[in-house]
Swiss-Prot record:
One of its GO terms (cellular component) is nucleotide-excision repair factor 4 complex. InterPro entries: Leu-rich_rpt_Cys-con_subtyp (IPR006553), LRR_dom_sf (IPR032675). It comes from Saccharomyces cerevisiae (strain ATCC 204508 / S288c) (Baker's yeast). GO terms for biological process: global genome nucleotide-excision repair; nucleotide-excision repair, DNA damage recognition; protein localization; response to UV; ubiquitin-dependent protein catabolic process. Residues 1-22, 41-68, 105-137 are annotated as: Disordered. It comes from the Eukaryota. To S.pombe SpCC613.14. This is DNA repair protein RAD7.
Length: 565
């Protein structure tokens, strides 16, 4: 039953009426009223009008100056859009307000020191002002050119485009990806396929370049059911789509029908892949041996079971990531039906998987070569015992070992697993132990001193926070120094300059030194001299690396603070 409450009577002088009543009460007590403020405003406006009469003479020059600045800025924006790699839709999003903000807004302190451009019109009252206006115009043009050059350089660095001159092949693929939407409309109007359009213009796209075209289309978010017809070729054996978010379930079925000889298929961000499409792929692709799926969250346990039954005896490589519906039961069905034929397995960010202890029981293939277990939902699900048992089964033939985000691993896995079961002359090509913050320098130094890694190509210790100089030095004293092409030492805060004195790898092309405190200009110069094929160094968070760093030709720094726009 509703019960009325005792409420204060309205109309009281000190009554609290709302969140602004206290302020209103204060203004009333101090004698501050809206009428007084209004009168003062009128007085200021009348004074401004009197001063404005003296500036009418220079108004025409002011308008021409402002118009010229706007024209230069608009030309700059148009040039930037014309030379960029975005789609037509992205280009159309550049608004008038965004273009006008380019003049007063900039992060370069040097520009503010050389020229202070006011947002208000410049008044010209004498010949000296005209000369000053000319100088300001010149400075404005230089500033705009510098901004355009910086934006282009920064965009190239972030996209890791280190080659200034693109090949004709890459230019053609870029042009296709940029104009694919327009060609699709023209093809719809003329009832012709997009592939026929490309064949008429360029003579078609070779099978070897289809994967490059797929990367370009995925980057521009232009891969859909219509552009998918470019890849419907009967002689296609391998196909990788980096972004399938716009491909419907019918598109996957069409791909399976018109490309029946596919043996390797990688579908990233395949959120629309449903039960029917997955089973259709299994039935219509009899030669399929390798399947990589990212984000197939529509597939349930029953469908996974049917799929693995169909693929029994022929599935050799299976990688899955980012789905909560791949459960322990699904993993069990995979291992029971296909475990004996698997030579490569990848499990990443699977929130419903906890029983990783099943793996050592079923991965018994003598040719097993790739194991990737990344970011388990519970850190204790992947522990030293499980990995040691796994290495006891497959360590002899392992070529790729990725254990990123398995933060429960300790030195025991390194000593009793890697060192014990990997042969002295092992075929290991990829080793990644990212975010294993319990692994120390001593265990890795012992491992590198006992096992020769003559085939190691890629190595990553990102965020292994306890690693110091001796672990890296021991790696470089190993046979790996002659084969390494990619090395990731991101966030190894314990490293000093001594570790980089020994970093001389003839085939090293990529090095990540982000957030390594000791890296400065002298280290960059030394690394460039000691590694002749090094082309890219990531230096994000290394504030000691400045624009004064001496770099040899062909070496590019990405993430340097002085290169930011």
């Amino acid at each position: 039953m509703y019960r009325s409450r005792n409420r204060p009577k309205r109309g009281g002088e000190n009554e609290v009426k709302g969140p602004n009543s206290a302020l209103t009460q204060f203004l009333r007590e101090e004698g501050i009223s809206a009428e007084n403020i209004k009168q003062k405003w009128y007085q200021r406006q009348s004074k401004k009008q009197e001063d404005a009469t003296d500036e009418k003479k220079g108004k025409a020059e002011d308008d021409s100056f402002t118009a010229e600045i706007s024209r230069v800025v608009e030309d700059e924006e148009i040039d930037e859009i014309g030379t960029g790699s975005g789609t037509e839709t992205e280009r159309a999003q550049v608004s008038y307000d965004a273009r006008m903000k380019l003049v007063p807004a900039d992060s370069d302190e040097e520009e503010y020191e050389t020229s202070h451009i006011s947002d208000t019109p410049v008044s010209l009252s004498s010949a000296n002002d005209r000369e000053s206006l000319t100088k300001k115009r010149q400075n404005t043009a230089k500033i705009i050119q510098n901004r355009r050059r910086k934006r282009k350089r920064a965009a190239d660095l972030l996209d890791r485009r280190v080659n200034k001159v693109s090949s004709l092949q890459s230019l053609c693929i870029t042009k296709i990806s940029e104009n694919i939407s327009k060609w699709q409309k023209e093809a719809d109007e003329s009832s012709k396929l997009v592939f026929n359009k490309l064949r008429d213009v360029l003579g078609g796209v070779s099978t070897a370049n289809l994967n490059n075209l797929a990367k370009a289309l995925s980057k521009n978010r232009a891969l859909n059911d219509h552009t998918l017809q470019l890849f419907l070729k009967t002689d296609l054996k391998r196909l990788t789509f980096s972004d399938c978010s716009k491909i419907s379930f019918d598109g996957y079925k069409t791909l399976a029908i018109f490309s029946p000889h596919l043996t390797e298929l990688s579908l990233q961000m395949c959120g629309q892949l449903n039960h029917e499409s997955l089973l259709y792929i299994a039935e219509k692709l009899p030669n399929l041996k390798s399947l990589n799926l990212d984000g197939p969250f529509l597939i349930n346990e029953d469908t996974w079971e049917k799929f693995f039954v169909i693929m029994k005896g022929r599935l050799e490589e299976f990688h899955i990531s980012n789905t909560h519906r791949f459960t322990d039961k699904s993993l069990s069905n995979l291992l029971i039906n296909c475990g004996s034929t698997l030579v490569s397995l990848g499990l990443s960010r699977l929130d419903s998987i906890s029983n990783y202890a099943l793996l050592p029981q079923y991965l018994v293939n003598d040719e097993f070569h790739s194991l990737c277990i990344e970011y388990p939902f519970n850190e204790e699900d992947v522990n030293d015992e499980i990995i040691i048992n796994l290495l006891g089964q497959i360590g002899r033939t392992l070529r790729k070992l990725v254990l990123n985000g398995c933060i429960d691993l300790t030195d025991s896995m390194i000593i009793n697993g890697l060192t014990a079961f990997i042969p002295e002359k092992c075929p290991l090509e990829v080793l990644s132990l990212e975010e294993s913050d319990q692994i120390t320098t001593d265990s890795l130094s012992y491992f590198f001193s006992k096992v020769e890694l003559n085939n190691l190509i890629e190595c990553s210790f990102r965020r292994c926070l306890q690693l110091g100089d001796m672990a890296i030095i021991e790696l470089l004293l190993n046979g790996a120094r002659d084969s390494l092409r990619s090395l990731n030492l991101n966030s190894l805060k314990e490293l000093t300059k001594e570790a980089f004195v020994a970093l001389a790898c003839p085939n090293l092309t990529y090095l990540d030194l982000g957030f390594v405190r000791c890296v400065d200009d002298s280290v960059i110069q030394m690394l460039g001299e000691q590694n002749p094929n090094l082309t890219v160094i990531d230096v994000f968070g290394d504030n000691l690396v400045t624009e004064k760093a001496t770099m040899r030709p062909g070496l590019t720094l990405i993430g340097r603070q002085s290169d930011s726009i």
